[in-house]
Amino acid sequence: MTSAASPVRSAAHLKVLSAGAVKYVLTDFAPRFTRDTGDQIDFTFGTIGGVQKRLRDGETADIIMGTAPAISQMEQSGVIAAGSRVDLGRTLTGICVRADTPMPDISTPDGFKQTLLKARSVAYTNPQAGGTSGIFLVGLLERLGIAEAVGKKALLCINGDEVVDKVSAGDAEIGSTFLSEIVPMKAVKAVGALPPPMQNATAYAAGIMTGSSNPEAAERFIAMLTAPAQRNAWLSLGFEPAGHG
């Protein structure tokens, strides 16, 4: 008597709603995930403030990725399924210039301050749009006493991609956003992270949205994304991965 064949798992179609800082890690990994599992993924990226607004407006997803405090709050409020939160890693705020221009000195707090003051224009994410790096930078400028001077020549952007675009096009002399949004881009070069005394590592996490229609596939995606085998990919794209495995 022949035993019945195991049912074939049908491919899932995952929807991921994510903060932009993780964008290039995800888009680098997604083709390999689809090749290995057959599952398809649709991404929607924005600032964490934009992600939160989409959720308030009733948008749904299978996976949500954002700053670690925001994901923890979503888990506490029931937006994310209890126990599904996973740390992804952290990235630093950095400075970029066009690929064909000299590198300014930001190795010290004073060097960083003078670089911003001397720059013709500075692009960064709009804090009012919920851009994490922009919120941090504006607070730092206020502490340094140069918020007004830099603000007069600021180009406020909707996300890190626009920051990079402004710099690569020559509209902004200097750009500031997360290194994970700078390092993958060829048209600009990373000057580096802000000097240690004023640096703020931003941690990111993921979780499965309560009511996801594909919780098993979502869990599989997060597990494969954070596996030790992916560590070098995270590092090469400006992220320090969390210590999974």
Label the model's feature ranges.
Residues 1-44, 49, 53-60, 68-69, ...:
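Exported/periplasmic ABC-transporter solute-binding proteins
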